[in-house]
């Protein structure tokens, strides 16, 4: 694929789509949503599970994909999480200080209430571990009703309706490549 034009785009993933190139068991994959974006063969960077929504990056730039998905590159991710019941202050503090899951310790860099009823919280993490946000809350006895990734490695889904995508700006691409993001 040497010489192929590099393509970078971001999708606001809707619920019900699997983050996969081709899953024979899936009704719908995210690739259907970006199939008309370009002629180049692009791939999702990282994953959002079928029931999660929000920001998902696509590219054909293998070097950038390796950089962004490698565990040693810590990228800031912010999620808005809707829970089945109010998150107690004690549980929130525990998540901020750190909890131990089956694959090790995890803590939130920041966590805050989004709604007064305390069933919606914003959580900022740098970990790329599989289904980490859901597992944090499930470990604490909460069911996640909705999970929305609103920020990833300096990118936001601002002004992007659910199911829509856009190409990254030259500045966004340069920021990602240089690692100049939180």
Give the positions of each predicted feature:
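Basic, flexible Lys/Arg- and Gly-enriched helix-loop patches that mediate nucleic-acid binding at interfaces
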Residues: 1-182
């Amino acid at each position: 694929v040497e010489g192929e034009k590099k393509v970078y785009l971001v999708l606001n993933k809707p619920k019900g789509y699997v983050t996969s190139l081709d899953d024979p068991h899936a009704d719908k994959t995210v690739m259907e949503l970006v199939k008309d974006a370009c002629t180049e063969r692009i791939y999702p960077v990282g994953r959002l599970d079928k029931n999660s929504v929000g920001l998902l990056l696509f590219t054909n730039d293998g070097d950038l994909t390796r950089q962004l998905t490698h565990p040693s590159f810590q990228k800031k991710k912010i999620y808005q999480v809707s829970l089945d019941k109010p998150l107690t202050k004690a549980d929130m503090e525990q998540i901020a200080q750190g909890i131990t899951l089956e694959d090790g310790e995890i803590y939130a860099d920041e966590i805050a209430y989004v709604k007064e009823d305390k069933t919606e919280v914003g959580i900022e993490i740098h970990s790329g571990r599989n289904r980490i946000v859901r597992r944090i809350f499930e470990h604490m006895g909460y069911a996640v009703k909705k999970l929305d990734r609103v920020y990833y490695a300096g990118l936001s889904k601002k002004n992007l309706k659910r199911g829509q995508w856009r190409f990254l700006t030259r500045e966004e691409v340069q920021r990602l490549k240089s690692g100049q993001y939180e």
